[in-house]
Curated annotation (Swiss-Prot):
Domain of life per record: Bacteria
InterPro entries: PCRF, Pep_chain_release_fac_I, Pep_chain_release_fac_I_sf, Prokaryotic/Mito_RF, RF-1
PTM info: Methylated by PrmC. Methylation increases the termination efficiency of RF1.
UniProt KW RNA-binding keyword: no
MF-aspect GO terms: translation release factor activity, codon specific
Protein name: Peptide chain release factor 1
Gene name, Swiss-Prot/TrEMBL: prfA
Organism: Ureaplasma parvum serovar 3 (strain ATCC 700970)
UniProt subcellular location: Cytoplasm
N5-methylglutamine: residues bearing it: Q236
Functional summary from the UniProt entry: Peptide chain release factor 1 directs the termination of translation in response to the peptide chain termination codons UAG and UAA.
One CC-aspect GO term: cytoplasm
Length: 359
């Protein structure tokens, strides 16, 4: 029975590690940081160990069928064994490919919640309007995935928004939303355009993984916390109390603010989450110049030529330029149906990683 021996051995090692992690978890009942680290590892190793058990069972069935075919003379048993062997030969390569994908290195932030910041870039009013349009898309996408969205700050202008920030929490949010970082280009006829000319504008989207307190340590003495009256939507408390909070990390100058919560305490907690995410990003960029350049290239300046995706309204078309994927269903995508694009981006990323997997 042919199978990938190198892959088998690699997966078997993960299954052994999974058992060891389970035993270790029983011994660290008071070390909460260690418990978290082990559980993060177990989430991946348990999935691989379970897949390995099914793989081994299918492989054992194929090997047993081969043995019967080589030794048995009973025609009925031979027929059944041949069926088992044929099924194993079809399924084992499929299972092996799935196992390879499971072995691919993953972003340690994939399981984390995200903080998203959206800003208009090139294109004037249409850019501000599209910030609101794409925000509605993300809100619908969050609902489709049973994720929870919390608005951090919304700054409206005469026609749309000059800034929107929000948090999305749920299962594996960053693993999917991270592909939204970059310049989004929109092509459509503005409502004020009398001659029907198509205008092109852009907005920028930044997606940051939320960081826990244990991941980013902040010295309280290095913070300046300012309170001010919230502006815009937010309920009866707006402009009556200084509920909005702005936190400045003095050593770096990084600022995080929130005004959409109902109380100063709630806004302060949200602003701290934003600050941790921003400080984590700053630390990553400082430690890894290559990462910094990658993100800079990804988000860019907002220039029309630096787009990751184009939304063409007249032709009901969306094109993701990173993978040359074009879908003629802009109306559906803007209603939150982003999975087809994001799944294709994930598959493309996995293909690249697979090429470097020595198995």
């Amino acid at each position: 029975m042919e199978y990938n021996k190198k892959l088998y051995e690699a997966i078997e090692r993960v299954a052994i590690k999974n058992d060891a992690l389970k035993k270790e978890l029983e011994t660290v009942v008071t070390d909460f940081k260690k418990i978290k680290e082990i559980n993060i590892q177990l989430k991946k190793t348990t999935k691989i160990a379970e897949a390995f058990a099914k793989y081994k069972q299918k492989l054992d069935t194929g090997i047993a069928a081969e043995k019967i075919l080589n030794t048995e003379k009973d025609l009925e048993l031979i027929e059944l064994a041949q069926m088992d062997l044929d099924e194993a030969k079809i399924n084992i390569p499929i299972i092996e490919n799935d196992l390879k994908i499971m072995l691919l290195p993953t972003d340690p932030n994939d399981d984390k919640n995200v903080i998203v910041e959206m800003r208009p870039a090139a294109g004037g009013d249409e850019s501000s309007i599209f910030v609101g349009n794409l925000f509605d898309t993300y809100r619908a996408y969050a609902e489709n995935n049973n994720w929870k969205m919390k608005i951090i700050e919304m700054t409206p202008n005469a026609v749309g928004f000059s800034f929107i920030s929000f948090m999305i929490s749920g299962e594996e949010v960053y693993s999917r939303m991270k592909f939204e970082s970059g310049v989004h280009r929109v092509q459509r006829v503005p409502a004020t355009e009398s001659k029907g000319r198509v205008h092109t504008s852009t907005i920028t989207v930044a997606v940051l993984p939320e960081q826990d307190e244990v991941d980013v340590v902040i010295n309280p003495t290095e913070l300046r916390i300012d309170t001010y009256r919230a502006s815009g939507a937010g309920g009866q408390h707006v402009n009556r109390t200084e509920s909005a909070v702005r936190i400045t990390h003095i050593p770096t100058g990084v600022v995080a603010a929130c005004q959409e919560g109902k109380s100063q305490i709630e806004n302060r907690e949200t602003a701290m989450k934003m600050l941790r995410a921003k400080l984590w990003e700053a630390a990553q960029e400082q430690q890894n110049a290559e990462f910094a350049n990658l993100r800079k290239n990804q988000v860019g300046t907002g220039d029309r030529s630096e787009k990751i995706r184009t939304y063409n309204y007249p032709q009901n078309r969306v094109t993701d330029h990173r993978i040359n994927l074009t879908l003629n269903k802009l109306d559906q995508i803007m209603m939150g149906e982003l999975d087809e694009i994001i799944d294709a981006l994930i598959a493309d990323e996995q293909t690249g990683l697979m090429a470097n997997l020595d198995i």
